[in-house]
């Protein structure tokens, strides 16, 4: 592990996206525009609802974010799948941060509920992931619950987010 801070700014996230944070062939965040947060404000190995880890991140919402111009014309809203992907991105980051080896892949989730939308007038999105379990065998598998809030109101809840880290020769579809 090269870098194990308790928070990461945008430059740190970009370094992760370039593969510079956890070593070659290991967990990477996507680069913009698919990187769905601007900073990780907190990451711990023993915090969160289940005492097994917590990661919290933020996105500063601006009306010119790329998805508002195309989803939908005259009715801009952040696609719900992008908020979900942010939660998966965070689980993968956590697995790399704890020393897991391999490339991250989202593997599914148990349940997802939307009760609001991310609209251009929103100022800040906060993402929270509570780690429930990490299994380390042929692959590293993380299972977590997460939520997304807009300006303090929780509008997405995801249960049993699953992310795996796969060695390059063991990744799904290879």
Curated annotation (Swiss-Prot):
GO terms for biological process: unsaturated fatty acid biosynthetic process. InterPro entries: FabA, FabA_FabZ, HotDog_dom_sf. CDD domains: FabA. One of its GO terms (molecular function) is trans-2-decenoyl-acyl-carrier-protein isomerase activity. The active site is at residue 71. Its main location: cytoplasm. Its EC number is 4.2.1.59, 5.3.3.14. It is found in: Cytoplasm. One of its GO terms (cellular component) is cytoplasm. Keywords: Cytoplasm, Fatty acid biosynthesis, Fatty acid metabolism, Isomerase, Lipid biosynthesis, Lipid metabolism, Lyase. Necessary for the introduction of cis unsaturation into fatty acids. Catalyzes the dehydration of (3R)-3-hydroxydecanoyl-ACP to E-(2)-decenoyl-ACP and then its isomerization to Z-(3)-decenoyl-ACP. Can catalyze the dehydratase reaction for beta-hydroxyacyl-ACPs with saturated chain lengths up to 16:0, being most active on intermediate chain length. Belongs to the thioester dehydratase family. FabA subfamily. This is 3-hydroxydecanoyl-[acyl-carrier-protein] dehydratase. It comes from Nitrobacter hamburgensis (strain DSM 10229 / NCIMB 13809 / X14). The gene is fabA.
